[in-house]
């Protein structure tokens, strides 16, 4: 049966990737349909109740800078906020927040239900409608057909999902939800490379059965950081602490004695798990010299007694889970509310994607989230926003867009995935970016909001606030540049107290701010340079831009050099066997990867600078280099 309406874009899945994809498409004015197997699970946090962290917080800020929802949602649902690496440089500082699951999910659902151009419908998708290597719609579980110009799949861990607790396994997309078997089978018929990954989650604990008096409390920052560039502290709900406990030798002994009952160690699970979020049994075996591991006890919300023990993800049998939990300090009488489990699922090799998240084999079909081999809510949200945007552009017959590696962590993410692929769940870190000093949390809006406005993602309110911030920054920098003091100026003694060496010559406010020992807030407390900006975001930018000016300029020069041939297009029908001078290995790798540009080709494993030079000579010889690329 054919549904009575056609759509521009269909998004399949209502998790963190799906919600951002649907909202991005709808914000750009496209008629969008979000299909989910259960409307009640929209925006659900399937694993840990937290958003952000090193690298991840950067992605959230970028999603926010492009009009996405995640930062706004966590500002309204966060019950503990912290700035990680606060004592380090601005490039690696990151925001992290504990979430109230119920508040977060409710905020996301409300945003989806009230978004113009967006329709929600509850049905699982079993099939794609493909005509001449182009997707034109989907078929649901009950045979209902929906037609659209573009389809975004954000199916999480549901494709062929299998849940493991001990040696028992069952089909499932996550605990309590059915898997997508028919869709997984259908996708395996298409020419994509497919493999299996696994992830896991810890048992949940009833807080009323825990002795908090023996645990170390971990409080959030005061004042609390804010995630969204439009956020305010008054949006935050009541703040509460987390707690810390540790595993011990007794815990480790329980695990070692029961490894024969672990599906991972017994060879039942084939999928590779996340390197940076290993199960407790994996940690005990891999780090055999450690007799203790730190476990963070995270509240799941303000209106529930459930606790999330971050650090003991496991697929061991339930009776062993009870022993593990009760071996830890403060948990001697703990009651498990939900058992931990591992889940195995299909993912598709992201090297089969273009940089727009469109698949190379099926036009108009986009993948985002764990289907691409990533792990984490933040990575999913970033992919979802970009896939939804590009599906919208595709449906309008416009050229797709994705940021470069030097423009955003979102650019690093898709570039890593589409050029190198992944054999294990991919997680974002600041160390993955070459230009970290430029890709800071604090300047995500300066990097991306203008482009997002051009693409139709930014509303008038956010645009006005962005321009106000830019104006405040420019005015303040000009004020500091043009305000001078000398050794004889009034109040100079107060200034000298802040300096390592007293002033010997005339200096501007900007000259003084470059000194490492003086901060913007200290400088603007002095009569000569008062008052400070009321706009704290603008003030932070002024300080960072002045203090790191030399380093920032150096990185920008490096980027300009590297960009010379970054966007030089490689014809889709180029036969690399016809390019004289390329080795058989290089020909094979380029033929398989089908890179869209010289920049992408240069980052494929095994492609040498010499091979890139040969390609450029070939392009020039055949008149395929644009003016300005030949120098």
Swiss-Prot record:
GO terms for biological process: tRNA methylation; tRNA wobble uridine modification. Coiled coil: none annotated. NAD(+) binds at residues 273-287. FAD binds at residues 13-18, 125, 180, 370. This is tRNA uridine 5-carboxymethylaminomethyl modification enzyme MnmG. SUPFAM superfamilies: FAD/NAD(P)-binding domain. Its cofactor is FAD. It is found in: Cytoplasm. It comes from Vibrio parahaemolyticus serotype O3:K6 (strain RIMD 2210633). One of its GO terms (cellular component) is cytosol. It holds the Pfam family GIDA. The keyword Cytoplasm applies. The gene is mnmG. Belongs to the MnmG family. InterPro entries: FAD/NAD-bd_sf, GIDA_C_N, MnmG, MnmG-rel, MnmG-rel_CS, MnmG_C, MnmG_C_subdom, MnmG_C_subdom_sf.
């Amino acid at each position: 049966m054919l549904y009575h309406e056609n759509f521009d874009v269909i998004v399949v899945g209502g998790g963190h990737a799906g919600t951002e994809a649907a909202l991005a498409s709808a914000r750009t004015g496209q008629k969008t349909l979000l299909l989910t197997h259960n409307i009640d699970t929209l925006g659900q946090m399937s694993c840990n109740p937290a958003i952000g962290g090193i690298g991840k917080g950067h992605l959230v800020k970028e999603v926010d800078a492009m009009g996405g929802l995640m930062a706004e949602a966590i500002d309204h649902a966060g019950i503990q906020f912290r700035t990680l690496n606060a004592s380090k440089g601005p490039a690696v500082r990151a925001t992290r927040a504990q979430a109230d699951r119920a508040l977060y999910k409710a905020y996301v659902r409300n945003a989806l239900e009230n978004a113009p151009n967006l329709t929600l419908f509850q049905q699982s998708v079993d099939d794609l409608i493909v005509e001449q290597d182009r997707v034109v719609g989907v078929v649901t579980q009950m045979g209902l057909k929906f037609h659209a110009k573009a389809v975004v799949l954000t199916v999480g861990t549901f494709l062929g999902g299998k849940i493991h607790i001990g040696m028992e396994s069952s089909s499932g997309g996550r605990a309590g939800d059915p898997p997508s078997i028919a869709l997984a089978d259908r996708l395996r018929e298409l020419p994509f490379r497919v493999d299996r990954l696994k992830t896991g989650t810890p048992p949940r604990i009833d807080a009323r059965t825990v002795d908090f008096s023996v645990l170390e409390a971990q409080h959030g920052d005061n004042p609390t950081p804010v995630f969204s560039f439009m956020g305010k502290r008054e949006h935050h709900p009541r703040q509460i602490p987390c707690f810390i406990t540790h595993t011990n030798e007794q815990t480790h002994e329980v695990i070692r004695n029961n490894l024969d009952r672990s599906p991972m160690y017994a060879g039942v699970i084939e999928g590779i798990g996340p390197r940076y979020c290993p199960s407790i049994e994996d940690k005990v075996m891999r780090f055999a010299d450690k007799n203790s591991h730190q476990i963070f006890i995270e509240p799941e919300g303000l209106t529930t007694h459930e606790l999330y023990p971050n650090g003991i993800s496991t697929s061991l049998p339930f009776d062993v889970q009870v022993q593990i939990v009760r071996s830890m300090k403060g948990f001697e009488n703990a009651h498990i509310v939900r058992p931990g489990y591992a889940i195995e699922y299909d993912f598709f090799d992201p090297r089969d994607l273009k940089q727009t998240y469109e698949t190379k084999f099926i036009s108009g079909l986009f993948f985002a989230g764990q289907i691409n081999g990533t792990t984490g809510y933040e990575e999913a949200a970033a992919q979802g926003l970009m896939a939804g945007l590009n599906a919208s552009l595709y449906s309008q017959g416009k050229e797709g867009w994705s940021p470069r590696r030097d423009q955003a962590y979102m650019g690093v993410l898709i570039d890593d995935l589409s050029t190198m692929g992944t054999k294990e769940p991919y997680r974002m870190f600041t160390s993955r970016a070459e230009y970290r000093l430029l890709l800071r949390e604090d300047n995500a809006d300066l990097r991306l909001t203008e482009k997002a406005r051009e693409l139709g993602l930014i509303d008038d309110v956010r645009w006005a606030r962005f321009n106000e911030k830019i104006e405040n920054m420019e005015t303040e920098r000009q004020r500091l540049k043009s305000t001078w003091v000398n050794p004889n100026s009034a109040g100079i003694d107060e200034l000298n107290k802040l300096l390592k060496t007293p002033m010997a010559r005339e200096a501007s406010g900007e000259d003084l701010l470059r000194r490492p020992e003086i901060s913007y807030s200290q400088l603007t407390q002095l009569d000569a340079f008062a008052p400070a900006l009321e706009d704290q975001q603008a003030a932070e930018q002024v300080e960072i831009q002045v203090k790191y000016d030399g380093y920032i300029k150096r990185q920008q020069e490096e980027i300009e050099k590297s960009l010379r041939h970054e966007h030089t297009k490689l014809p889709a029908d180029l036969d690399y066997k016809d390019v004289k001078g390329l080795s058989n290995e290089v020909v094979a790798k380029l033929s398989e990867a089908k890179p869209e540009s010289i920049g992408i080709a240069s980052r494929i494993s095994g492609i040498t600078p010499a091979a890139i030079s040969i390609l450029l000579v070939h392009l020039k010889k055949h008149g395929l280099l644009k003016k300005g690329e030949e120098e």
